[in-house]
Swiss-Prot record:
It catalyses: apo-[ACP] + CoA = holo-[ACP] + adenosine 3',5'-bisphosphate + H(+). Belongs to the P-Pant transferase superfamily. AcpS family. Disulfide bonds: none annotated. This is Holo-[acyl-carrier-protein] synthase. The gene is acpS. Transfers the 4'-phosphopantetheine moiety from coenzyme A to a Ser of acyl-carrier-protein. It is found in: Cytoplasm. Pfam families: ACPS (PF01648). Mg(2+) binds at residues 6, 51.
Length: 115
């Protein structure tokens, strides 16, 4: 099992988004993921989730794992769900993933566990 964690100030993501708009979103979220954004807290949570997912691999966001190798969605109970690209799943021998996202007191945090 490997674990990754990321925390970010919601105001930081909000500031970047207000400055760069959709161009910022397009750099790390697919159109399907952009639909999940309800407010700055959910946007920050998505950022933290992708960062945590890359850290769980032990590589971070780089040439080995781009933002688009990581897909965030929701399950039938509206809980966050994580899926890696086929290449990442194969290269890192991933059989299971778990993602938790939370927001409180101006911060968003995400924790990812992979097996």
């Amino acid at each position: 099992m490997r674990v990754g964690c990321d925390i970010i100030a919601i105001s930081r993501i909000e500031k970047i988004h207000s400055r760069h708009g959709k161009n910022f979103l397009d750099k790390f979220l697919s159109p399907k993921e952009q639909i999940l954004i309800k407010n700055p807290a959910t946007l920050a949570g998505l950022w933290a989730a992708k960062e945590a997912a890359s850290k769980a691999l032990g590589v971070g966001i780089c040439e080995l794992c781009s933002f688009f190798d990581i897909e965030i969605s929701k399950d039938e109970k509206n809980a966050p769900k994580l899926k890696y690209s086929q290449k990442i799943t194969k290269d890192f021998n991933i059989t299971q993933t778990s993602l938790s996202i939370s927001h409180d007191n101006g911060f968003a945090i995400a924790i990812v566990a992979i097996v």
